[in-house]
């Protein structure tokens, strides 16, 4: 097993996740199976209860584990579907150590950070790597070198480095190379970051410099001199127009060749699908504007997978997607409004704040023939809007938003009743969905059975299905033997489509999600017709 560990210095938010995912992509293109592990030093067990304003999107894995958004980058770049074991948190490690202590596994020892916590970290990494049957294990340590939360993990990595063969271990350190007022690239932050890393017993094999422009030869030479690495191990990672260009930047920098020599590997093949995908993406000449109507629009990472899935759909449809961010609360405070866009998307979410604004956006899309895609909460709100304005249940609602609504067209899942804990208790992960033949959904997917990821507590109330369908809204897919509605569509609308599941979590740049492809194609058609 070869281990590539990615750490970060100077500041958070430099793009360690994209760096790690891009390195993984390089090895995938050379014919290797790569498996990622993301270490998050926070004490939370998982990301499921975290506020999107603080943490961005909660990404859902196939086994239902709620994780950091970087796991989404890994799945999209590397092409592997992973499980909750591929996300290590301080909470998980401490929980495991405490459980062992309670069972007496430590035989009366004083349980300490070293060796018990560090041994648990190493054991977890090696177990996941072995069970994956991969050839390369990519480990990203979240946070910044020097953070107190990350110290046990860095110590565990130091020990692993000493325990593994030199040719089986590579450490990549991502740092910031800022520009001063005169435009000079400054290396001092990188020097200090590497110094701090070395004080912990770790020496980087590769230094990736994040900068607004390509690192100059003189900058690379200076970093190499003061940080004690070869010049060829100083890699430029300048700002790119799109994150999918980063693997190509690394290939230009010959990072793949350097790591192959360090790990004593040879390329098995030379795949071009990623490079070809980026070329297609950069040559799209038609455009369509799509509004994302949500309440977390000030934190764009809260809808990261949706942004990426729209991009994937655009590549397939031959169309560049321009996103227009609309705060749903703003739509609640106006008598009338116009959304000058080619498509409207209402994403997942929770709670009453902004919900009525989303319902108004859905009504606008339905009445004006604007292509619409609803996801999870957006699916539920689409059902509510239809029940109110077409079926005639003017006070229809979800019991999440109004416990006393006379028409609870959306209600709590039966198995959710009586659950008090929030973390990891929703209907989560991959679930098989059955699609009815002859529907828009069947045309998009081309199959009667699909597997999609879920994250919800509420569902369409079965008592209202027949009444709603009698007025024209078709529930075209279901799960759990027909008990749960999964897709709603309007056959006579240019494109009105909503899913209870989250199709964005399984969308890939070279294998886009069918609902997003259909949605973007409909938006492009709408734009063409508007221009005539």
Swiss-Prot record:
ATP binds at residues 13-18, 70. Pathway: Pyrimidine metabolism; CTP biosynthesis via de novo pathway; CTP from UDP: step 2/2. CTP binds at residues 12, 147-149, 186-191, 222. L-glutamine binds at residues 349, 377-380, 400, 457. UTP binds at residues 12, 186-191, 222. Belongs to the CTP synthase family. This is CTP synthase. It comes from Archaeoglobus fulgidus (strain ATCC 49558 / DSM 4304 / JCM 9628 / NBRC 100126 / VC-16).
């Amino acid at each position: 097993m070869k281990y590539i560990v990615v750490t970060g210095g100077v500041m958070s938010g430099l793009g360690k996740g994209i760096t790690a995912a891009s390195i993984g992509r390089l090895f995938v293109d050379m014919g290797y199976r790569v498996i990622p592990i993301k270490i998050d030093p926070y004490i939370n067990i998982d990301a499921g209860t975290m506020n999107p304003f603080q943490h961005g999107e909660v990404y859902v894995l196939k086994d239902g584990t709620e994780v950091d958004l970087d796991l989404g980058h890994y799945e999209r770049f590397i092409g592997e579907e992973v499980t909750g074991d591929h996300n290590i948190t301080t909470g998980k490690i401490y929980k495991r150590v405490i459980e062992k202590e309670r069972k007496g596994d430590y035989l009366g020892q004083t349980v300490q950070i070293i060796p018990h916590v560090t041994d648990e970290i190493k054991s977890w990494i090696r177990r996941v790597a072995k069970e994956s049957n991969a050839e390369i294990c990519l480990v990203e340590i979240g946070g910044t070198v020097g953070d107190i939360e990350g110290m046990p993990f860095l110590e565990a990595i130091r020990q692993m480095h000493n325990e593994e063969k030199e040719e089986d271990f590579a450490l990549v350190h991502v740092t910031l190379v800022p520009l001063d007022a005169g435009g000079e690239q400054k290396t001092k932050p990188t020097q200090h970051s590497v110094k701090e890393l070395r004080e912990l017993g770790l020496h980087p094999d590769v230094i990736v410099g994040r900068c607004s422009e390509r690192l100059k030869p003189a900058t690379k030479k200076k970093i190499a001199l003061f940080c004690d690495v070869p010049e060829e191990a100083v890699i430029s990672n300048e700002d790119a127009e799109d994150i999918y260009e980063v693997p190509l930047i690394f290939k230009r920098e010959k990072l793949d060749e350097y790591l192959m020599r360090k790990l004593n590997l040879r390329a098995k093949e030379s795949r071009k699908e990623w490079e070809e995908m980026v070329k297609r993406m950069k040559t799209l000449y038609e455009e369509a504007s799509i509004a994302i109507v949500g309440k977390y629009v000030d934190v764009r990472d809260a809808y990261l997978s949706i942004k990426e899935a729209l991009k994937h759909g655009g590549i397939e449809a031959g169309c560049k997607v321009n996103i227009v961010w609309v705060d749903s609360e703003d739509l609640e405070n106006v008598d009338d409004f116009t959304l000058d866009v080619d498509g409207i998307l209402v994403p997942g979410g929770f709670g009453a704040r902004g919900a009525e604004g989303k319902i108004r956006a859905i009504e606008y899309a339905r009445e004006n023939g604007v292509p619409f895609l609803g996801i999870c909460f957006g699916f539920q709100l689409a059902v509510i809007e239809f029940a109110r304005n077409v079926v005639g249940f003017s006070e229809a609602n979800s019991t999440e938003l109004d416990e006393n609504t006379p028409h609870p067209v959306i209600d709590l899942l039966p198995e959710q009743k009586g659950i008090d804990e929030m973390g990891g208790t929703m209907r989560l992960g991959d679930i098989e969905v059955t699609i009815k033949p002859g529907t828009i959904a069947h045309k998009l997917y081309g199959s009667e059975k699909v597997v999609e990821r879920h994250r919800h507590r509420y569902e369409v109330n079965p008592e209202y299905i027949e009444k709603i369908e009698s007025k024209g809204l078709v529930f075209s897919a279901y799960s759990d033997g027909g008990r749960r509605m999964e897709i709603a569509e309007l056959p006579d609308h240019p494109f009105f489509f909503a899913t209870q599941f989250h199709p964005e979590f399984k969308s890939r740049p070279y294998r886009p999600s069918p609902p997003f492809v259909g949605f973007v194609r409909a938006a492009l058609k709408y734009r063409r017709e508007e221009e005539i």
